[in-house]
Amino acid sequence: MTSTAPERFKMETNFEGLIKLLAEHLYSEPDVFVRELVQNASDSIVRRRRAEPDLAGRIEIKADPSTRTLRFRDNGLGMDRRDIREFLSVIGSSGTGTTRRELTGQGGAALELIGQFGIGMRSAFVVAERVVVRTRKVGEPRGFAWHNSGSVDCELYADAKEEVGTEIIVSVAPNYAFLLEESRLREVVVRYCEFIQFPVSVNGRGPVNAVEAPWHRAAWPSDEARAAGYEDFLNRRYPDLILDVIPVEVSGEYEARGALFISDRSLPDINTAGTVDIYVRRMLIRAGDDSLLPPWAKFVRGVIDTPDLCPTAAREQVQRTHPSFAHIQRRLGDCIVERLAYLAEFEPAKFERINRWHHYHLKGMAFHHEEFFERVVDLLLFETNRGMMSLARYVAEAAARTTEGRETPLYYFAYRGAATQFYRLAEARDLLVINAGYTFEEELLRKYAGRHAGRVRLERLDATDDPGLFGRLSESEQEQFRQLELDMEGHLLRSGAEEVRVQVRRFEPEDLPAVIIETAESEAERKLESRLTALALTDAFDDLAREALEQSRRRPRRLSLNASNPLVLRLLAEDRRNPLVREVMLGVYHSALLYSHNLLTPSNAEAVHGHLVRLCSMSLADGEALLRYRPEDEELDLVG
């Protein structure tokens, strides 16, 4: 019988290849090893200060281009033989992680530890031909040296190092010799290690790092001095005009400190995100991160320093799945909301300035945050036919035009492309109308009206046939215009226009011949068509969606002709069998499409273009066609 027992064996590992693989592919930038080695030095000093709290820690970096070497020195705790064998000679082992667990268990200062010594030091092999570690631990009679050239073989022996601490000597490969330039080193230290709590010098000059940020100060002489300190810090760091500063103090299960600010940057792209530089225990992990701030905080930038976010293995990103990420993101959102709500109540002039810069994004915040909505909704700005206007001002001005005791109408339209025609309609009737064409705006107006039921009523102009705007005709006028309605419907249908129901109303201004009003069905059709264009669907779903679209297209769109318009009155009087008159009827429809940009699809645009060319050609060919036309020349089958 054949044995079915599985074969067992150990996987073989190419240690030299593994070290190089980790070094070269874990880190995106070659100079990241400077950050890692400075982190190691800082953590070593933190460990020594547990027993010597008054120790003045220092970190020195020296470059020697002639020998292609970089030296990193610190006066930290140092290592003995056991530490070296455990943390330097075992791939994947981290002395800092072990010490952090010990300090946490003892209630110690684990929050000050930054890196992962055994893992982070491997980053040196991104650029190194060889790494030498010389170290002497506090209380030990002698030091040790460890050599490695990026292979499984390493050397460990006694060393005559006199001072306590560690020195790491990196022999830089020729193709990375540019990293030995002092200006480059200083730039790297400032970028990554600006807030390390110990001074870092480069070639004897320094400190290069700032050491402290405003949130590291234990006390300020006054609130004004604190605010000025934060603003000065941000002004030196960012080129933006700062509209307001938001100090961050998050405590509790997860902690974070830092400074956010509201920028003057214009944000036309709805996909723009607010960005922060993320520091973990004072060390830069990610610059310009666009994931930590809430999605609606698009106009906010700043710096966040936290001990609780978990860096990835390469320490160039944070783990978004860790519970700390969602918690800190939520608390940062709370800080932003609380600050803006405070400004709205106590510093309205500053809030109005921010509002004018970022009214769209503030409305997004109000949509997501109930408390923020309640506190600022009256101050939110909307575009109207009289310029930008807060809801409070709109309601006050509209109420002055409303009969006492009746609900104040809040007129709006939901498609920005229709602004021109509805602004003209509103101006002619001395009405205020809101352009609620951006995301959230219509929903916010509905929410606002719901809060003020009985006092305010919503009137959507682009989806209603309101008699207050579109006056009804008398019975005799209806009969007079009925044939024009039928003739125009028939000609539009034969011309390939989507199904349109023509109705005659009387509205102002008189020089506006026609407007198109959306029905709920035609609005749904347009949204469905837009999504079909944007989405890649499976064949089955695509067929189903397009069938639904075809069904919806059978529902007509309303074209309202203006009974007071001279051109419409001329069409009423002319013989509509005349080819030129028919082209004019089509032109009236196209003019309404052009006034409502949201309805101008590619197919509509092509039809408008073709009609214009055709009309121009007819005029050039025979400018007297209308005058010479005789009914007996041709018989046309018109509707009705």
Where are these regions (language model features)?
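GHKL (Bergerat-fold) ATPase N-terminal catalytic module, capturing the glycine-rich phosphate-binding loop
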Residues: M1-E182, E187, E194, E632-G640
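GHKL/Bergerat-fold ATPase module in large chromosome/replication-associated machines
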Residues: L113, R134-D153, A173-F178, S183-G640
